[in-house]
Curated annotation (Swiss-Prot):
Pathway annotation from the record: One-carbon metabolism; tetrahydrofolate interconversion; Amino-acid biosynthesis; glycine biosynthesis; glycine from L-serine: step 1/1
Species name: Salmonella schwarzengrund (strain CVM19633)
UniProt-recorded name of the protein: Serine hydroxymethyltransferase
Site label Plays an important role in substrate specificity, positions: H228
GO CC terms of this entry: cytosol
């Protein structure tokens, strides 16, 4: 018999200590990694529920195991909410991650060796959009497109490459691009050569749900996303589509199960259902609007302090600082800010002279700080502190002064009050 009073603290002190230290780190550090966010206690309650015990291979109403009548309700709620939130008529909520969702799309639509047009990782794309170290780059013939001199996606180049290479699929989406993507233009290019348009909206799904960023679902053949990042749910993936192509939907379902995965994680799917409901609330729209405002406010400070922002600004939740002119590496900047309890990630910038392990830039995102209540005044102050650190990167006294300010503002704006 399992007793409800069982706990980790009494049983595994070593593990519990690490968990508690991570909790403190999240409260006492300012999180600016663009792909990170804080999920709600409701989502965590779902993920720590007895749903974790249930195997449910298959889909609602078509399971390979008995006893699925209640998890069917859970999964159907998640499916229906995903479709409603993004205006889709198909949703698969089972992918364990965004990469798994992307893998399923490749598997459903392509054969190994097919040509794919994807955004260059060094110019803002994602590993799963064709990086040679990823399955996408190993199994498919990848043709990369990029950005122009202004830092915007070069649609003329994309159209030219599409016409020349005749890819079977074009991928829209990014991990480090601060502009607005013209999904309709991408579909036009795809249609001109008879290619699929697949959009990975993982980074901007929350903004899209709130109407702050254009929705790709009406334009793409298939859309994927993570359920964390701006959507602020549990770590997981989601596939969406619109257009009524039932054969395509069957292929997508089969590509997730049984092709790529076995049993779905029902406790995570419950967490997704909670997060999708939260994303329909009026306060979620206000939150996402503030995410965009905060990113713009931070960019303004960096520009005024003489820092180069890739593409000159941001139209979403993230932006890149190009530190080449400052003679700093992304690795150095990441480490120095980390010592001041400010967490960012080093990131390659266009035409980066440094390796991906060193880089010449950092990526900054506003979702997590906005989640804890920061508005323009706080993020402007924060951006100023970051400039102080970067201007004096070897001055530990400056870093300690900034760290003290960070600890103070974190205490005033707790993640979990």
């Amino acid at each position: 018999m399992l007793k409800r009073e069982m706990n980790i603290a009494d049983y595994d002190a070593e593990l519990w200590q690490a968990m508690e230290q991570e909790k403190v780190r999240q409260e006492e550090h300012i999180e600016l990694i663009a792909s990170e966010n804080y999920t709600s206690p409701r989502v965590m309650q779902a993920q720590g529920s007895q749903l974790t015990n249930k195997y449910a291979e298959g889909y609602p109403g078509k399971r390979y195991y008995g006893g699925c009548e209640y998890v069917d309700i859970v999964e159907q709620l998640a499916i229906d909410r995903a479709k409603e939130l993004f205006g889709a008529d198909y949703a698969n909520v089972q992918p364990h991650s965004g990469s798994q969702a992307n893998f399923a799309v490749y598997t459903a639509l392509l054969q190994p060796g097919d040509t794919v047009l994807g955004m260059n990782l060094a110019q803002g794309g994602h590993l799963t959009h064709g990086s040679p170290v990823n399955f996408s780059g190993k199994l498919y013939n990848i043709v990369p497109y990029g950005i122009d001199e202004s830092g915007k996606i070069d649609y003329d180049e994309m159209a030219k490459l599409a016409k020349e290479h005749k890819p079977k699929m074009i991928i829209g989406g990014f991990s480090a691009y601060s502009g607005v993507v013209d999904w309709a233009k991408m579909r036009e290019i795809a249609d001109s050569i008879g290619a699929y348009l697949f959009v990975d909206m993982a980074h901007v799904a929350g903004l899209i749900a709130a109407g702050v960023y254009p929705n790709p679902v009406p334009h793409a053949h298939v859309v994927t996303t993570t359920t964390h990042k701006t959507l602020a749910g549990p770590r997981g993936g989601l596939i969406l589509a619109k257009g009524g192509d039932e054969e395509l939907y069957k292929k997508l379902n089969s590509a997730v199960f049984p092709s790529a995965q076995g049993g779905p994680l029902m406790h995570v799917i419950a967490g997704k259902a909670v997060a999708l409901k939260e994303a329909m609330e009026p306060e979620f729209k206000v939150y996402q609007q503030q995410v965009a405002k905060n990113a713009k406010a931070m960019v303004e400070v960096f520009l005024n302090r003489g820092y180069k922002v890739v593409s000159g600004g941001t139209e979403n939740h993230l932006f890149l600082l190009d530190l080449v002119d400052k003679n700093l590496t992304g690795k150095e900047a990441d480490a120095a800010l980390g010592r001041a309890n400010i967490t960012v990630n080093k990131n390659s910038v266009p035409n980066d002279p440094k390796s991906p392990f060193v880089t010449s830039g950092i990526r900054i995102g506003s979702p997590a700080v906005t989640r804890r209540g920061f508005k323009e005044a706080e993020v402007k102050e924060l951006a100023g502190w970051m400039c102080d650190v970067l201007d004096n990167i070897n001055d530990e006294a400056t870093i300690e002064r900034v760290k003290a300010k960070v600890l103070d503002i974190c205490a005033r704006f707790p993640v979990y009050a």
